[in-house]
Amino acid sequence: VGNILAAANAVIENNDERLGKNLRTDAEAGDKIRYYSAFTDLEEAQFIVDETKALEREGWDLDEIAVLYRSNAQSRVIEQSLFRSGIPYKIYGGLRFYERQEIKHALAYLRLAVNPDDDNALLRVINFPPRGIGARTIENLQTASNEQGITLWQAACNAGAKAAKIAAFVRLIEALRNQVGQMPLSEIIVGILKDSGLTEHYKTQKGDNQDRLDNLDELVNAAIEFKPEDSNFETLPENISDDPAFPILAFLSNAALESGENQAGAGEKAVQLMTVHASKGLEFNAVFLTGMEEGRFPSEMSLAERGGLEEERRLMYVAITRARKRLYITMAQQRMLHGQTQFGIVSRFVEEIPPEVLHYLSVKKTAYDSYGNTRQTAAPKDKIINDYKQPQTYAGFRIGQNVRHAKFGTGVIIDAVDKGESARLTINFGKQG
């Protein structure tokens, strides 16, 4: 529709070397693009859930709703929110977060930390990353296991000092076991990624290595956010909460649930999740374009490459034009990155869109996110449309803008009153308040 094409054309016009002409349409202007600045990535995901439910109530088919993101790792929080809300979804052209190879490897080490007799987990990682334990050696362990009626772990422990590489693997797992109950879950996972060599292995690989590293970082973020007390206790043994391994067991149980058979089956209508790259050639009635922060889209890497920004802008053009009727653009002012809370600012691509084709969603009442900080939540659904408005400035500042204070560090403007020299700002500095 007209507003969507106007936004796409306005963005691509900022490229010096443009290919082709602007797209035109005889259709009406249609809905304005809905822009929502969430305080956290968790709130951003919940907004997507709430809007998807509203669209479904209005008669929109789920398979005509798509969620786009710049990198695969961004899907984890969105998947989690859709799963917990019972909204069926599919990952187009990829795997669910907990089904990705690098995540399965990391979780296999975590499983061995609480149960070294898990043969499947041991077989997955005994020689991954490669540590010189060949197929013949593994076959010998399996033979010993079968003949003596013992687990592969017990066979590995019995291999003796002569089997130096197996002995080194045994020491690695023993070291992980000693951390259980002594360290937070997230720190144990960080240790696994480092001590197992997983992170270093993927750093040396070509192709999609950065995607895999980003996913491993996101696994650490998931562990930081995870609350064992919110687990599905039906999948865990009785009285497990007193076990030192409880946080790990609960996390593994949660991961198994989210990677199970809950993804929509063949022929079932479901929300489509995909990267912007994967969306090329596809169109949907409603599209959520998420993670629209500087350094994320455009990506930080592209900003350092010659021609990278223009390529990212072409991708933005693709993303916008995937929407036939309705487009949502969302960002999070706060995300977990490398295990730390990071503040973000709105993408330059959003600022290149003409204000007249945007509706800005106001942020409403205060609540708490799982990072332990106060945040803002959106107005009820029936008030959303009436609460969209153009951004106002206060003494040169605007709500949602990131600012830096000499004492308190970086913060986000979450409220403002009055204008000019009498303007007063409310700023969230994370833990500083």
Predicted regions and their residues:
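Helicase P-loop NTPase motor core
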Residues: 1-88, 111-115, 177-180, 391-394
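Short, basic/glycine-rich phosphate-binding loops at helix/coil junctions
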Residues: 24-32, 197, 297, 373-375
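Conserved helicase C-terminal RecA-like lobe
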Residues: 61, 75-87, 100, 107-360, ...
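Short acidic/glycine-enriched loop/turn segments that link adjacent beta-strands
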Residues: 29-30, 268, 420-422
